[in-house]
Amino acid sequence: MKTLRHIWFPLLLLLAVFTAPAQAARLVIMIGENEYRTWETLPEFAKNDITPHGHHVTIIQADEADKNHFPGLIEALRNADLLLVSVRRRTPRREQLDSIRAHVAAGKPVIGIRTASHAFALTPKAVISDPSLGVWPEFDAQVLGGHYTGHYGRDAATIAVTPGRESHPILSGIAVKKLIGHGGLYKNTPLEKTATLLLTGTIPGQITEPVAWTHHHGAKPGRVFYTSLGHADDFKVPDFRRLLLNAIAWALHP
């Protein structure tokens, strides 16, 4: 697994999944989790779904020998237009975490999937013994607008559109009934008041939970999209990939 890969393909076609024609942008995809195989699904998604739109994508993978080290992240974020996060409970080096904070402070877009809600948060009993590493447990609430507290297990959830949000551009062309939520439903209630709920999920005997929403962060408000979907089987569903593409287009063009 390479830690830094640059993927570039010329503009070959424009798919209808984007809500509007998009100018070429520089995207950074940050990957550091061991559960949902996004180290495979996201590079494939970048190659097959993002780069045909002319975008340049830099994949940053956690170092195989040091799961908290993300080689190339600082350099990649300096000129990035958008950051997509798929990280679970990592404590990056402080300077790497600072580069993410700088991206956020500049009002640049952020997209989070699945475990991004607890990307830089440790479990309650865990401690950091290395002072060069940092945590950011508030990333979920401050940036993503969520409130992750766990999940309900592996039961698939029934996904539905929030009433009144049917015409939101991120949901354009999405057959929501085809979204399943293969990895189990996350507990994300309540969202921040500044979040806009788009999709909910329900499993029998439990309350309905937020599954996808938008948010704005920072003094220079940047667009944010988060979804608790992102299991490897979700990426097999064209409507889920279309959802992410729509979110990228929406985030890049306020």
What are these regions (language model features)?
Residues 1-6:
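Positively charged n-region of N-terminal signal peptides that target proteins for export
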Residues 8-19:
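Bacterial N-terminal signal peptides
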Residues 24-26, 31, 41, 48, ...:
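Extracellular ligand-binding/catalytic regions of CAZymes and related secreted enzymes
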Residues 26-29, 34-119:
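Helical hinge/lid and interdomain linker segments adjacent to catalytic or ligand-binding clefts
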Residues 30, 89-169:
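A glycine-rich, often tryptophan-bearing local segment used as a flexible ligand/cofactor-contacting loop or short
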Residues 51, 56, 79, 146-220:
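Catalytic beta-strand/loop cores that center a nucleophilic Ser/Cys/Thr
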Residues 59, 110, 197, 224-226:
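Conserved beta-strand scaffold positions in the cores of enzyme catalytic domains, especially
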Residues 135, 139-144, 148, 178-195, ...:
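Oxidoreductase and adenylate-handling cofactor-binding alpha/beta cores
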